[in-house]
Amino acid sequence: MISVRFQGKPFNITVVQVYAPTSNAEEAEGEWFYEDLQDLLELPPKKDVLFITGDWNAKVGSQETPGVTGKFGLGIRNEAGQRLIEFCQENALLITNTLFQQHKRRLYTWTSPDGQHQNQIDYILWGQRWRSCIQSAKTNQELTVAQIMNSLLPNSD
């Protein structure tokens, strides 16, 4: 977990990046993850704009949960997805990349080694207070670290 706070006008922005334990992890590890994340969320002032992004290793599915998810998630909710939804309910957060209808390739963020299965396990969380500001939320499973780095580094030609 990492966090950065940007000073801005009229609001400061706090961004948290997470990597949640997988379903193979001990249950206690999952509990520690959410406890640590909750502690981290207590640090910035409540008026900050808050983003939490990352690999949640959870499937929230396409079933809408009012105030938390839209109906445009991928697949069927699993236990980790239910835990993520409960965390969002407790903290007034939206799972933004379930709010907008998109092509399936813009939803899935994990592909099985044999290429037969895709899951949506990476999410962008945003405070419910700021719902009207969200215009789009997309993921790109095909974007590699090398592509990201190449786009950030100056051209050396």
Where are these regions (language model features)?
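A shared catalytic/ligand-binding motif for oxyanion handling
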Residues: 1-157
